[in-house]
Every structure is written in structure tokens, then in C-alpha cells.
Swiss-Prot record:
CDD domains assigned to the protein according to its UniProt record, in alphabetical order: TilS_N
Binding-site positions, ATP: S25, G26, G27, S28, D29, S30
Gene transcribed to yield this protein: tilS
Source organism: Brucella canis (strain ATCC 23365 / NCTC 10854 / RM-666)
Xref: InterPro entries: Rossmann-like_a/b/a_fold, TilS/TtcA_N, tRNA_Ile_lys_synt, tRNA_Ile_lys_synt_N
Pfam families per UniProt: ATP_bind_3
Family: Belongs to the tRNA(Ile)-lysidine synthase family.
Protein name per the record: tRNA(Ile)-lysidine synthase
The protein's Enzyme Commission number: 6.3.4.19
């Protein structure tokens, strides 16, 4: 008996979408996904449009022909297909990670262009096991949050859901399904290239591992991650736990923090460091432990700089403080009609007709600006403005948005951005992200 498309796909609610993107490389996993998905959508009364998208990473001479062959197969079976190419210069290091980032960027753009609510990928149970083993080797200990491996659901760029419905299906089961249907697949030779981490794990430790035992460890890691997340969600429900000012400085109640378990404390302070620093990832396990020890008073320093964030321990009941350090702050152009993220912390949209540069003000420049506008603010607020975005026009400081009573250029909009959640949000962390956003908010106000 073959695999059941209804059992595989129904839990994901694909039927509510206008269109669904299937990421198809031509390998057995993605082709198995495509044809099972096609069968499932045919059972729906008003099915979404199925669009197969092949990303040609331009890493091998054969890739263009392979993408073309996927298109011919789709044409034969009445499936829409398009090819997207990664034409950017390829990095000398971190090629696999860069290719993955480019692939998802292209897939998200394809989904937005098609009005698709879902991108569906063919990650299998084998991939899940490999991911666990890769992350375990990197982390060096079993408490790492990443050992929960891949989530069946993720949210990409805040708008497109990534579904991985085959995480409980083996690669061999998909190949048996394709063989039964008489459909051939292509084996990418890079999958056997041990210069890359995943093939090295696949052909080494994963081949010798007890798959069922690994899956049990994944479940245990997932449960631990859920416990820590739930503790933070509960803590964040209390408004006294966490506060924020306009520039993004966060104030963590020391007593609320101390009441959490060590694992939850490490997660909480690591998360706030990532938000303050505008980073897409948590600090590593060792860094999170270091932050927790400092805030808990186990280590002598009262200040740490981690991940672009300056973290200060509160004393005598004062809150712990998290803010951006004043280094490596970017300068970006903001032209009419443009939507950009500045420093991973603020999102700007220019619906007006003027162009600006966004950058932090210099200290003397800010002092002169305040003097010329007849303003006088205390030192703490001035320091906050120095790590906040300002608007320049024609090389001249035109506006300091977070200054009390500041005049904003017409058509310029700003809101808070959470880089750790707004680009790739694993389903494991949906509730945590909602709790953080509810407490910190998106709207930005003046520094008062």
C-alpha cells in the first residue's frame, strides 16, 4: 500500500491558500512530495493552484538541464513550473548556508508573486535525523535548543508559511512511491560530496545511528524547548516582567528573571540580547550561559557585550538592561517606495517623494542639532539617541525620529523589527514570538 496524501497533508490546512509552492529539485524527496501533493489537492473541492518551483543554484554545469527536465515532467502531468536562478557571486566559505538562504529568498519571492500562502518542501525523516546529528555535533551537549530539529511548520518573512509534511516519512518510502508510479529521479552528486557537512553526516554517523533512538531524542529535546518557551510565555504575561523604551532598550525585572529555571533564564536573556543586537539567531549555548551567570551574580562583571548587545546587571532591585552597543551601526539609503530593515531593529517604509539616508547621529552632530532646535535632554536619553536611527537629507541631519516632539518627514513610517522572529520563525516558537511582540510592541514612540 502506498503513502496516504490525505494523512500527510490535511493537518497543514493547505486548502485555505490561493496557491501553493512546491520546492522541487528533481531528486526523489522533492518529486515524491510533488506528486503526493498533487494527489491531495485533487481531493479538495476548491484546491489552490499548485506551482512547482526549481531553484537553479548555478553550482554545477548540469543544473540548468536538470531544472529543464523537471519542467518537462511537470508539463507532462499538468503542473505549473518555473525556474529561479541564484545568480549572485558565490562565497568562498559557507557555500551551503549561503545557498540555503538564497533558495528561501527566491522561494518567498515566488510565493509573494503568486499570492501563495505556503511553500512546501520535501524534507524527510532522514533529513530530520541528520539535522539532529549535525546540531548535536556542533553543540557538544544535549541541552541545545536546536536539537528539537526541524519544525513541521515555520513562518518566513512574516508572511509565508513553510510546511514540511514529510518529516515522518522515510526517503525509501518516497522512492518506493515514485517507482510504483514509474517516475525517475536524479541524484545530485553534491549529496555524496563529503566536503559538505550534511553528506558527511549522512554517509557517516547517520548511516550507523539507530534512527528510532534519534527520533526519541528529538522528541525529548522538543519537549524541553517547549517547557522553556512556556515558562517565558507565562512570565511575559506579567507587564512587570519586561519593559522597553523607544530606542529599544529593554528592562528585565530582576526578581522575575531569578524566579525562572536556569534553562529558561538562559533562553530569556539570550533572546533579549538577540533582539537588542538586531540578530537573527540566539547567542550560542556558551554565551547564553555566560550572560545568565553574570545577571545572576555568579560572575563578577556587571556588564557584557554579546551579539551587538550591551547587557548590564541591575543592582539592589533595579532591572537588568539590554541595549544595542554603539558599534557597527549601518548607513542605508531610503528612497521613495522602499521598505528596508535598519540594523535588524527597525523597519522603515518611505511612501513619500523624498530620499533619505538612515544612520545613527554622531555625538557632536546630535549636540548641535539639539542646540539649534532649542532642546535640552538628559545624558541617558542622549545616549539612547546615539544608537537610534536618524534621517539625513543631502548629507545634513534632517530628523531624529525618537526625539520628543520630533517632526517626521512626510511619508516616512517606522516600526520595531524583531530579526530573530521576522525572517525565519520555527513553529516551535510561535507562541513565544507572540508573547514577546505583545509585551514589546511594534509601534515606536519618542524617547521620554
Amino acid at each position: 500500500m502506498g503513502l496516504s496524501p490525505v494523512n500527510i497533508f490535511k493537518p497543514f490546512g493547505l486548502g485555505r491558500a490561493k496557491a501553493v509552492i512546491a520546492a522541487v529539485s528533481g531528486g526523489s524527496d522533492s518529486l515524491g512530495l510533488l506528486f503526493l501533493l498533487k494527489d491531495y489537492l485533487s481531493t479538495l473541492e476548491s484546491p489552490p493552484v499548485l506551482i512547482a518551483v526549481t531553484v537553479d543554484h548555478k553550482l554545477r554545469a548540469e543544473s540548468a538541464l536538470e531544472a529543464e527536465n523537471v519542467g518537462l515532467l511537470c508539463q507532462k502531468h499538468g503542473i505549473m513550473h518555473c525556474v529561479l536562478s541564484w545568480d549572485d557571486p558565490k562565497p568562498a566559505h559557507g557555500l551551503a548556508a549561503a545557498a540555503r538562504t538564497a533558495r528561501y529568498r527566491l522561494l518567498v519571492q515566488a510565493a509573494r508573486d503568486a499570492g501563495a500562502g505556503f511553500i512546501v518542501t520535501g524534507h524527510t525523516e532522514n533529513d530530520q535525523i541528520e539535522t539532529f546529528l549535525m546540531r548535536k555535533a556542533r553543540s557538544g551537549h544535549c541541552e541545545a535548543r536546536g536539537l528539537a530539529a526541524m519544525s513541521p511548520r515555520s513562518l518566513l518573512e512574516g508572511s509565508v508559511e513553510l510546511a514540511r509534511p514529510l518529516l515522518t516519512v522515510s526517503r525509501q518510502a518516497l522512492r518506493d512511491e515514485l517507482t510504483r508510479r514509474g517516475i525517475a529521479w536524479v541524484d545530485d552528486p553534491s549529496n555524496a560530496n563529503i566536503d559538505y557537512e550534511r553528506p558527511r553526516v549522512r554517509l557517516g554517523v547517520a548511516a550507523e545511528a539507530d534512527g528510532q533512538e534519534v527520533l526519541e531524542q528529538i522528541a525529548q529535546a522538543g519537549a524541553a524547548r517547549e517547557r522553556d518557551n512556556a515558562a517565558l510565555v507565562e512570565a511575559l504575561a506579567d507587564p512587570a516582567t519586561l519593559g522597553v523604551d523607544a530606542a529599544g532598550m529593554m528592562f528585565l525585572n530582576a526578581d522575575c528573571y531569578a524566579a525562572l529555571s536556569p534553562g529558561a533564564r538562559q533562553l530569556f536573556s539570550g533572546l533579549l540580547a538577540s533582539i537588542a543586537g538586531g540578530r537573527r539567531f540566539l547567542p550560542g549555548d556558551g554565551e547564553r550561559r555566560r550572560i545568565e551567570r553574570m545577571l545572576s551574580g555568579q560572575d563578577a562583571p556587571r556588564r557584557l557585550t554579546v551579539f551587538g548587545a550591551l547587557i548590564e546587571r541591575g543592582e539592589k532591585g533595579a532591572p537588568h538592561r539590554f541595549r544595542r552597543e554603539r558599534r557597527n551601526l549601518p548607513k542605508l539609503d531610503l528612497v521613495p517606495g522602499q521598505h528596508i530593515v535598519w540594523d535588524g531593529r527597525f523597519c522603515f517604509f518611505n511612501s513619500g517623494g523624498r530620499s533619505f539616508e538612515i544612520a545613527p547621529p554622531g555625538r557632536q552632530e546630535l549636540i548641535d542639532f539639539l542646540k539649534n532646535s532649542g532642546r535640552d535632554i538628559e545624558s541617558r536619553r542622549c545616549e539612547a539617541l546615539l544608537i537610534s536611527p536618524a534621517l539625513y537629507e543631502g548629507g545634513k541631519l534632517a530628523s531624529v525620529p525618537f526625539l520628543p516632539g520630533a517632526e517626521w518627514p512626510q511619508g516616512v513610517h517606522i516600526e520595531r523589527h524583531f530579526a530573530i522572529f521576522d525572517h525565519v520563525l520555527p513553529g516551535h516558537d510561535f507562541a513565544l514570538a507572540q508573547a514577546v511582540e505583545a509585551r514589546l510592541g511594534r509601534a515606536c514612540a519618542e524617547i521620554s
